């Protein structure tokens, strides 16, 4: 078996570097097509989240290749410039890492639940784009299954340690904040709006299209069209942006000319909010790195021992499958 992975994550690079390696669904197909032109690469899966971008490859036995070089090529960056910001894993270290990743124990917020869906979505998208092979399919399925077992056996996370609740904690620590604007009606945006409403904040959420059936609107939320977001800034105390846009949703040149709130929270990668905004008078800007700073779980060491015990069983199952498949090929 020759599986290799390489990637960049929050432990290796700050958000301004990580966001350069984020891929949209529309760009992934081209990346996969280029990767699979190499006849020695049988399958590829890219896991791209707000905190990491990782490339998993199933290759010809004996082939040595650094997937991070391929990621740099796909993102049109010089590998040498970022060569000290990535990690490379091979063999059993790959599946162990993937299992731990799916369990949430490699996340900035220990044990968070969103990553298991992101891992599942990564393999599903690779399959849809004809990029995965049986080795990666089984490896990702094993990782997701092991994560489900960990989640049902151990209590690793609580709602208070999710990204939205971490943002809420920041908002609650500030005085005189009652009106919030959430930019983005995706999963994180809706969750953020719902949590704000539950905690008594007057909350407005942006919609790209205001037609019945096109958007899910959190109960109790007010709505405005996305194009009206700058005008709405005049009437809010905090703005939270959580979109998948490749461009800034808020630019300093447009904000500087209007009355603006003093608290901005950016939950996106690539970042939604122009980082220059923090240079404005009396403004605080939080991005994912600053939101997660200081998140500590005192029980991690003991919990990690239990997680590894569960994962080991699934890693054994994977290798048993692989050896069985290899014998079938030889007979």
UniProtKB/Swiss-Prot annotation:
* Organism expressing this protein natively: Acetivibrio thermocellus (strain ATCC 27405 / DSM 1237 / JCM 9322 / NBRC 103400 / NCIMB 10682 / NRRL B-4536 / VPI 7372) (Clostridium thermocellum)
Entry superkingdom = Bacteria
Q: State the family it belongs to.
A: Belongs to the glutamyl-tRNA reductase family.
Q: What is this protein called?
A: Glutamyl-tRNA reductase
Sorted alphabetically, which PANTHER family does this protein's record hold?
GLUTAMYL-TRNA REDUCTASE
Catalytic reaction(s) noted: (S)-4-amino-5-oxopentanoate + tRNA(Glu) + NADP(+) = L-glutamyl-tRNA(Glu) + NADPH + H(+)
Q: What is known of its domains?
A: Possesses an unusual extended V-shaped dimeric structure with each monomer consisting of three distinct domains arranged along a curved 'spinal' alpha-helix. The N-terminal catalytic domain specifically recognizes the glutamate moiety of the substrate. The second domain is the NADPH-binding domain, and the third C-terminal domain is responsible for dimerization.
Q: Give its E.C. classification number.
A: 1.2.1.70
Name the site position(s) for Important for activity: 97
- Give the keywords, sorted: NADP, Oxidoreductase, Porphyrin biosynthesis
Residues holding NADP(+): 184-189
* Quaternary structure, from the entry: Homodimer.
Q: Which gene encodes it?
A: hemA
